[in-house]
C-alpha cells in the first residue's frame, strides 16, 4: 500500500507515528511545500523572546523521517485527482496514492487594510517570518501589533521582554475572544498596560503608509494616529486547500471530516488545521486550528489509514501560555453566551482569576488568568468535560473530588 | 518494569516523601514547592493521597509537547522532561489528567517525577509502606491475592449462612 501525506507538521508527524504502529511495511510519502525539517509554529514566539534557542524549534523525529521509512518530497501539490487517486505536483510530476492524508495546515491571513502588504509588515507564522523579525527586533525600537489573538499577544510579550515599545491594536472590544471571557480579557489588558504596552481596543486601522524617514504611519479611525518602525499582523488563519478546487473532495473554509477523520472521498483523510471534525460538545464539524487537536486528529487519521477503525470522541479546544507574568489558559466553553452558570474561585484558592463554567448542570469549560498551579486543575477537568460526567459538588470542593476520584473504583 | 505504587489505605500523611523529593530536586532545601510528589489531605473525606507521576503507557503529555521535550528513559521507563528543550508553554500541565506536572517558576520550565534515575527517594523515605517501588508484576500479584482473600471471606460467610439456613429448616 502507498500512503501519502500532504504537510509536515503536528498532524502529519502524529499520523506517521501512529500509522507505523500498525503498519511497518507500507510506504509513506510526505510532501512539504514549506520545505526543511518539521518545526513547531507554537514555539516561534518563544524563540523570538529568547527563551528557546533556534534549533529547539524542530520537532522530534523531524530529522529522522528516514528511520520511520518515510520518503520526503519538497514540492507543491497543484491538484488532486481523486477518481484516479493521483496528486499532481509542481516539480515531481504525478504521484499515485492508495490512501491520502491532507494535513497541509493553515496560513496567516492579511486583514483588508489599505497598505498592509509591504516590506516591514510581518506575520509571526513561519520560520521565515521569525528570521526577518529577529533582525527587526535587534535593530528597531517601536512595534505596532495589529490583532490580539494568541500569537499576537505572545509577539507583544516577546517585544516587550526585549525592550521594544509596543502598541497593540484590536478591532474588537476586547482581547483574545477565542481564549478568554470578557473579564479575563480585561485583566489581560490591565496586565499588559502594567508592562508598558499601549492597548487599543475597538480601534479600526484605516490605512498604513510609509513615511520618507522609513517609519510607518498608521491612520486610525477616530483616534490619534501612531508611528511604528515595523508592524506585526495577527488576523486569523485560513486553511491551505487551494489544490482541492477541481476535486470531488468536499470543502468550505476547511474540510469536513467524520469521527474517523475521513472526508467524503473513501481513501482521503484530513487532520489538523485544514480539517473540521467533531467536537466533544456534539458539533459535527469544528476547526480549532490548535496544536493538541492536530496531534489527536493526526493520531486517529494515521491509525485508520493503516486499516484500523478507531473512532475520535471529538476535539476539546485548549490553550495555555505564560505571558506578562501570568498564566493564561482555557478549555471548552467559557463565553457567557455558551454557558448558563459559572463559579469564580476566590483569592484564597491561589489560582488568580479562574472561572469554572456550567451548562445544563455539567462542567463545560474553564478559563484562567492566574497562576501556573491552577493549570493542573484544567488538566484534571479534561476527562470530566470530555466524558460529560456530572459532578454534584460545590466547585470549591472540586480539587479534592478530582484527586480522590482517581482512587475510587 | 518497576513502578511506584501507592497504597492509600496505608498513607499516614507524614509528607516525608515530599521532603525527600524536594531535597533531591532542589539539591539544597526541603521546601515543598520543589517536590514532584504531593500529598493531598482531605479532612472531611478522611483521605490522604500521595500523588506522583504514573509514567503512563501512552502519555498524553508526551504526545502533545510542541517542543519534543518529553521522552521516555529507555532504562528506567520513566517519562522525563528535558529542561533544556522545554519552552515553558505548560501544554503538558494542561494535558495531564492527574495534575502531576508542576511548573518551576525560576527556570520557567515544567517539572515532573523522573523516578530519580531508578532510585525514587520518596519511596525510600516512606515510613508507612504506602509507597513502594516494585515490579508491576509483583504489584499485580499482591492485588490479586487481596481480591482472592476478599472472595474467600465472602464465600465463607455465605456458606455459613447457608448452613444456618438449612439447619433452621
Question: What does each model-found stretch correspond to?
Answer:
Chain A
Residues 372-392:
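A short, polar/charged loop-to-alpha-helix boundary motif
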Residues 9-13, 35, 108, 128, ...:
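Residue-level detector of alpha-helix initiation sites
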Residues 1-70, 158-179, 375-376:
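Beta1-alpha1 glycine-rich phosphate/pyrophosphate-binding loop at the start
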Residues 25-27, 68-88, 94-95, 161-257:
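A Rossmann-like FAD-binding core segment of flavoenzymes
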Residues 390-409:
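Cysteine/selenocysteine-centered motifs that mediate thiol-based redox chemistry or coordinate metal-sulfur cofactors
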Residues 117-138, 225-300:
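FAD-site-proximal beta/loop scaffold in flavoenzymes
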Residues 104-162:
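Glycine-rich dinucleotide-binding loop and its adjacent helix/turn
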Residues 1-2, 8, 21, 274-379:
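Mid-to-C-terminal Rossmann-like scaffold of FAD/NAD(P)H-dependent oxidoreductases
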Amino acid at each position: 500500500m502507498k500512503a501519502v501525506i500532504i504537510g509536515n507538521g503536528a498532524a502529519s508527524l502524529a499520523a506517521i507515528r501512529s500509522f507505523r504502529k500498525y503498519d511497518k511495511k507500507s510506504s509513506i510519502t510526505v510532501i512539504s511545500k514549506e520545505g526543511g525539517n518539521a518545526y513547531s509554529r507554537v514555539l516561534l514566539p518563544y524563540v523570538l523572546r529568547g527563551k528557546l534557542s533556534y534549533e529547539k524549534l524542530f520537532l522530534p523525529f523531524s530529522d529522522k523521517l528516514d528511520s520511520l521509512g518515510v520518503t520526503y518530497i519538497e514540492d507543491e501539490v497543484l491538484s488532486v485527482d481523486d477518481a484516479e487517486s493521483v496528486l499532481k505536483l509542481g516539480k515531481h510530476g504525478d504521484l499515485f496514492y492508495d490512501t491520502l492524508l491532507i494535513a497541509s495546515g493553515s496560513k496567516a491571513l492579511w486583514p483588508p487594510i489599505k497598505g498592509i502588504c509591504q516590506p516591514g509588515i510581518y506575520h509571526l507564522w513561519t520560520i521565515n517570518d521569525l528570521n526577518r523579525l529577529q533582525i527587526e527586533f535587534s535593530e528597531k525600537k517601536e512595534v505596532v501589533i495589529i490583532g490580539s489573538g494568541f500569537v499576537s499577544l505572545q509577539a507583544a510579550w516577546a517585544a516587550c521582554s526585549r525592550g521594544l515599545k509596543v502598541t497593540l491594536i484590536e478591532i474588537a472590544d476586547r482581547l483574545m475572544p477565542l481564549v478568554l471571557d470578557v473579564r479575563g480579557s480585561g485583566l489581560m489588558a490591565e496586565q499588559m498596560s502594567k508592562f508598558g504596552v499601549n492597548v487599543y481596543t475597538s480601534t479600526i486601522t484605516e490605512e498604513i503608509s510609509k513615511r520618507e524617514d522609513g517609519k510607518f504611519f498608521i491612520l486610525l479611525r477616530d483616534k490619534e494616529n501612531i508611528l511604528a518602525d515595523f508592524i506585526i499582523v495577527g488576523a486569523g488563519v485560513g486553511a491551505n486547500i487551494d489544490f482541492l478546487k477541481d476535486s470531488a473532495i468536499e470543502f468550505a473554509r476547511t474540510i469536513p471530516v467524520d469521527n474517523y477523520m475521513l472526508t467524503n472521498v473513501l481513501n482521503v483523510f484530513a487532520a489538523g488545521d485544514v480539517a473540521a471534525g467533531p467536537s466533544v460538545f456534539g458539533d459535527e464539524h469544528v476547526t480549532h486550528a490548535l496544536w493538541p487537536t492536530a496531534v489527536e486528529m493526526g493520531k486517529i487519521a494515521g491509525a485508520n489509514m493503516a486499516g484500523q477503525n478507531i473512532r475520535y470522541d471529538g476535539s476539546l479546544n485548549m490553550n495555555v501560555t505564560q505571558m506578562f507574568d501570568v498564566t493564561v489558559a482555557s478549555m471548552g466553553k467559557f463565553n457567557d453566551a455558551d454557558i448558563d452558570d459559572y463559579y469564580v474561585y476566590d483569592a484564597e484558592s491561589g489560582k488568580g482569576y479562574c472561572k469554572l463554567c456550567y451548562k445544563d448542570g455539567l462542567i463545560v469549560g474553564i478559563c484562567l488568568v492566574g497562576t501556573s498551579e491552577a493549570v493542573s486543575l484544567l488538566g484534571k477537568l479534561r476527562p470530566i468535560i470530555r466524558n460529560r460526567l456530572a459532578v454534584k459538588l460545590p466547585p470549591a470542593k472540586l480539587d479534592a473530588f478530582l484527586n480522590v476520584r482517581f482512587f475510587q473504583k | 518494569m518497576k513502578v511506584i505504587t501507592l497504597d492509600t489505605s496505608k498513607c499516614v500523611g507524614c509528607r516525608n516523601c515530599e521532603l525527600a523529593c524536594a531535597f533531591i530536586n532542589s539539591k539544597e532545601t526541603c521546601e515543598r514547592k520543589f517536590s514532584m510528589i504531593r500529598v493531598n489531605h482531605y479532612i472531611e473525606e478522611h483521605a490522604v493521597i500521595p500523588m506522583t507521576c504514573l509514567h503512563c503507557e501512552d502519555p498524553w503529555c508526551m504526545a502533545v509537547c510542541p517542543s519534543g521535550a518529553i521522552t521516555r528513559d529507555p532504562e528506567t521507563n520513566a517519562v522525563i522532561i528535558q529542561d533544556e528543550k522545554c519552552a515553558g508553554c505548560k501544554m503538558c500541565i494542561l494535558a495531564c489528567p492527574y495534575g502531576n506536572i508542576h511548573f518551576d517558576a525560576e527556570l520557567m520550565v515544567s517539572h515532573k517525577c523522573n523516578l530519580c534515575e531508578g532510585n525514587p527517594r520518596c519511596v525510600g523515605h516512606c515510613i508507612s509502606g504506602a509507597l513502594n517501588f516494585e515490579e508491576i508484576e509483583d504489584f499485580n500479584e499482591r492485588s490479586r491475592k487481596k481480591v482472592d482473600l476478599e472472595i474467600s471471606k465472602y464465600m465463607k460467610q455465605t456458606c455459613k449462612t447457608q448452613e444456618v439456613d438449612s439447619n433452621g429448616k
